[in-house]
Amino acid sequence: MKLGIVIFPSKMIQDKANGLRKRYDPHYALVPPHITLKTPFETQDEQLESIVNELHTIASKTNPFTLHVGKVGSFAPVNNVIYFKVEKTPELTFLNEEMHNGFFTQEREYAFVPHLTIGQGLSDAEHADVLGRLRMKDFYYEQPIDRFHLLYQLENGTWTVHETFRLGKGNN
C-alpha cells in the first residue's frame, strides 16, 4: 500500500491553487492541493496500525500553528515544478523531521521545502513563461493549521484520506 502525509490548506487557498493547477498540473485530478510532510512511501497493510499510532504521538507533540502561503517559486533547474512558497515554521520543520526519524526512517530525495504545487511537467519554455507571469502577481494567504492527514493511493492513482490527526495535546 502506498501512503503519504500532508496538510490540506483552506478551501480558499485550494481554490486559488486549483485555478492554476487545472492548466499547469497533470496531477490535478489525483489529489487536492496540499503541503507534503512526507513523500509517498510503500508499506505493508499490517504496519498501518503502528503508523497511525506513531502519527497520533507526533500530532500530540505539535502545537497548532499559522500557515503562511505567498509568492511563487520553482525548483528549476532540478525540475520544472512551480509552486506557492510556504513559510517554514518551527512546527512544519518539526513535523517533517519527526516523519523522517525513528519509526519513519526513509532516505530523503530532496531537502524539505514546504510548498503548494501549482504546476509541473511543463516544457522548459512553458515553465519559463508561466513562472514569469505568476511572479508578477501578488499572492499571500495565511490560515490556522490544527491537523494533518494520512493519505493512501487507490488503484486508479487518486489519493484519499485514511485518517486525520489533530495537533496538540488531548486532540487525538
From Swiss-Prot:
SUPFAM superfamilies: LigT-like. It is an enzyme of class 3 (hydrolase). GO terms for molecular function: hydrolase activity, acting on ester bonds. It holds the Pfam family 2_5_RNA_ligase2. Keywords: Hydrolase. A motif (HXTX 1) lies at residues 34-37. Its EC number is 3.1.-.-. A motif (HXTX 2) lies at residues 115-118. Coiled coil: none annotated. The keyword Hydrolase applies. The active site is at 34 (proton donor), 115 (proton acceptor). It comes from the Bacteria. Belongs to the 2H phosphoesterase superfamily. YjcG family. This is Putative phosphoesterase BCAH820_1309. It comes from Bacillus cereus (strain AH820).
